[in-house]
């Protein structure tokens, strides 16, 4: 049998008592971390989310309580009363904030017993993630995870405080809405009342926040759940949280300034880190040119260099033919790394192949300044000199080359840049480098669909100076979109929106969405745009990713209380599950087994 709580109430947490509290009578409640018996005296590390305090059961102080304590096991929930005393000098633990004291217990209540846990409740855990997620209620007792969840709460409060002070309104938008094309699959919810019709869970509140701007609420925000039925990675979840913002009568500069202040506030509140403002800004074109990708990690160099103009007439036909076909030849100089072995080079070649590179050429600069490489013989001395100057090549350097169409060349070398930085330990994990990437292309061409698709979403405004290209050269139309990138991870993105019905219809038409389809899917927006729409824009931060980086975790699953697996399942509750036949009948749904 367990004890009832009765009128026992906690006076302190397990992380707050110090030597200044000696001789104080206290009541603590929490979990048994571990138990030790020494010469008949029982010592217990007693834990709650605030910390650990050592409690002591001495048979000479209270034999009855001591006898009861002998039944205690790990993860039992206890309530204890006792007196704070100094630890003996040889038992002081300077690694614990409570390490100078212990509680001499004279009253004990066993509030709940526990079976042997599936794993030890410690930060150094050997259990697999599958086991941890199945027993998430135990996993969440670990100090590190509890600190992450508390940091998430602190970040959320900081966001609300900052935006409230700037006159933003926290306005809720619907979860049951209609399906719109936003790049990923929607989660559909069948309507019981309207048979054969479905709601969609929102991938973002995009259209509703634009409606709020049209309605006159000129500063809006939400910390809101969003849903996307997509293939998952370490930084993706089917349901995720974003900080969603929108403002009227603003341009890019004002939005960036406000959001930089928001991020500065969050970092100060959660990590006591003072960020320098403003953040660096580069265009999309510059990011691709220098780093190969649109989410560059700015904590290290290893920038890409374009050699196409130097090799278009070289004797090395692999390079020359690529340039003549409109491709690119680019290179990275890994300074001082000519000691790379053949095995290491082969590993990097295989890595580049993941991103469709057909090969990875390389050149080592020997101590005498000459080239060591299978391709060295194809270049004249003048060509070598020009390449050396362009790449700042010196003895003991190794240079890696990729030659292919622009997309493959940039992507493969951009990812290789990150891989080299990891291997060479160039990344300082205690450094936070932010950069805005601006002026993204408005659209890209989807070869499978044989039509243009919006890079961000269909409501992003084009740059005014590129409007005339919308009909004739849409791939070269730049947008008023911007992403915030932190340490190579996109944590937020937004844009100035289209606030003209005519321009919105024109952009939709460019995307292959004719008037009839546009009215069917976006008629409410198009009608609203004609009601007097202020210029407006905003952005959304991936809150889970932001907290992941703040907590220096590798996966957002470690900063979400109850995350899904990479197969979008909840191992704790075994969701998703089959619906009862009666439920399906109410919804007029029949499940058909499809053989894969």
From Swiss-Prot:
Q: Which residues bind L-aspartate?
A: 182, 228, 456, 497
- The feature of type site (Important for tRNA non-discrimination) is located at 38
Q: Which SUPFAM superfamilies match?
A: Class II aaRS and biotin synthetases, GAD domain-like, Nucleic acid-binding proteins
Query: Where do the annotations place ATP binding?
Result: 228-230, 237, 490, 542-545
State whether it acts alone or in a complex, and with which partners, per the record: Homodimer.
Free-text function comment from the UniProt entry: Aspartyl-tRNA synthetase with relaxed tRNA specificity since it is able to aspartylate not only its cognate tRNA(Asp) but also tRNA(Asn). Reaction proceeds in two steps: L-aspartate is first activated by ATP to form Asp-AMP and then transferred to the acceptor end of tRNA(Asp/Asn).
**Which family does this protein fall into?**
Belongs to the class-II aminoacyl-tRNA synthetase family. Type 1 subfamily.
User: What's the protein here called?
Assistant: Aspartate--tRNA(Asp/Asn) ligase
Question: Per the UniProt entry, what species is this protein from, by scientific name?
Answer: Desulforapulum autotrophicum (strain ATCC 43914 / DSM 3382 / VKM B-1955 / HRM2) (Desulfobacterium autotrophicum)
Q: What is the lineage of its organism?
A: Bacteria, Pseudomonadati, Thermodesulfobacteriota, Desulfobacteria, Desulfobacterales
